[in-house]
Amino acid sequence: MNVVPRKSLGQHFLVDENILGVIERLAELGPDDVVLEIGPGLGVLTRFLAARVAHVHAVELDRRLEAELAGIERTTLHWGDALRLDLASLAPSPSKLVANLPYNVATPIVAESLARTDLLQWCVMVQREVADRFFATPRTKAYGSVSVLVQLATRRTGFHPVSRDVFRPRPNVDSALVAFTRIGPGADPGVKRVVEAAFSHRRKTLANALALAGAASRERAVAALQEIGRGASVRAEELAPDEFVTLAEALA
């Protein structure tokens, strides 16, 4: 490996091919699939995907990896920030996101990808605590805005702990593969705005958090909570994902 991973980019390159079979199973790869991969690194997963699917769109920020990623069959390389990529411009259009996501952008990448309704399945390698957040239940420490957004759009279909030894450099945290599939369009912009505001001040009551974030006055928030059967003292982590939809409707 000639490229030194950069901590600033959250790079932990996948180097052990033994995990690839698990990815293939959890991602339910098929010959007609078009896959989006973000953070291909040294191309270990990219080559594996390209040999099994119709097309791979690989998005990489680090130009030092050009030599590692050049010439992979059935693969289009996109250089730049994945969070600024216009997924609608990709042709053919990907229906699956399969990736060893960079640690420092894994959560926003997944959250933003939910808005693309043509993406139907995800299989991502992330920090274990991030994977736990995606499908955390209300009233738990891990439950937050990304939990609500992910669960409004998807259901979990697979989970697999990943050894630290499959990466270089070896990370100081545990990782996991988590797979999920779309069940609906997910949160619209109004719901997303309420969810993010609700969790922006976790130590406050939900009504106060919404007021502090500028999403609604406290009085209006309390009235909306009462409309959905919740009291003024409820906190964001007590509401189930679908309750945020009804709350947003009450606030509209």
Where are these regions (language model features)?
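Catalytic cores of RNA-modifying enzymes
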Residues: 1-197, 226, 237, 246-249
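Conserved Class I S-adenosyl-L-methionine
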Residues: 172, 199-204, 215-252
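Amphipathic alpha-helical segments within well-ordered protein domains
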Residues: 196, 207-211
